[in-house]
């Protein structure tokens, strides 16, 4: 996935899902491939199914699962953000932060320096910004800046 070999990543995810239908890592991988390919409808469907599955089956002491659930909400928020559904994005960002704020803190400084032209906002920063902007009259809102939004990163729990 990190090497942008999306076809291979999707095949591996589907193979894992054939063996274990609700494999959360494979579901997240599949969603991240779809987001990377701008297939937002498909990504949203996978993330929503992952969220439903995790909310029904997650144990309180499953830190990886909790991080995956937070990342699923954060990534679904990113999709909504990119589709200009800012209220929906804010709800998903807030849910992600409430579940596990550390899991969606964003990339470290080294990753930013090596990979991004602009510093990507964290889920927390984006949620605060959206909340602030949504309080303003519609004609005063600045909800999207294409150049900065392009650098928004997806959230990957653990290694995918």
Say what each PLM segment does.
Residues 1-160:
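Alpha-helical tetratricopeptide repeat
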């Amino acid at each position: 996935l990190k090497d942008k070999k999306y076809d291979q990543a999707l095949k591996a995810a589907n193979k894992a899902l054939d063996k274990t239908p609700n494999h959360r890592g494979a579901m997240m991988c599949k969603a991240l491939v779809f987001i990377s390919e701008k297939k937002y409808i498909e990504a949203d469907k996978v993330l929503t199914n992952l969220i439903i599955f995790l909310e029904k089956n997650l144990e309180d002491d499953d830190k990886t699962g909790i991080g995956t659930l937070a990342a699923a909400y954060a990534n679904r928020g990113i999709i909504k953000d990119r589709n200009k559904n800012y209220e929906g994005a804010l709800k998903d960002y807030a849910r992600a932060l409430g579940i596990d704020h550390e899991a969606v803190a964003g990339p470290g400084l080294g990753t930013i320096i090596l990979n991004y032209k602009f510093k990507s906002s964290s889920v927390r920063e984006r949620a605060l910004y959206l909340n602030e902007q949504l309080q303003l009259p519609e004609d005063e809102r600045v909800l999207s800046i294409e150049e900065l939004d392009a650098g928004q990163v997806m959230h990957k729990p653990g290694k995918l």
